[in-house]
Amino acid sequence: MDPKKIARINELAKKKKTEGLTAEEKVEQAKLREEYIEGYRRSVRHHIEGIKIVDEDGNDVTPEKLRQVQREKGLHGRSLDDPES
């Protein structure tokens, strides 16, 4: 997210505590917060989808649900053509 938008979120939060927000500012704050949260969720999802879990012996123990997502996206050499990947 653009640093200017984050600064605006913080500015509105501070103003809300000190003097309150107008109706327009409340709408703007909600919109900015939703945009921030969506970006955060996207980032976390991308990070988790890129994880490959291995045990002490080097065996891939990635949960099947995550493996399926990785197959769909072609991550870690996984492929929909090879269900064992």
Swiss-Prot record:
Compartment(s) of residence: Cytoplasm
Keyword set, alphabetical order: Cytoplasm
Residue ranges with Basic and acidic residues bias: 62-85
Pfam families: DUF896
Superkingdom to which the source organism belongs: Bacteria
Signal peptide region: none
Disulfide bonds: none
Cytoplasm as UniProt keyword: yes
Region (Disordered): 58-85
InterPro entries attached to this UniProt entry: DUF896
One annotated Gene Ontology cellular component of this protein: cytoplasm
Family: Belongs to the UPF0291 family.
Name this polypeptide is given: UPF0291 protein SSA_1878
Organism: Streptococcus sanguinis (strain SK36)
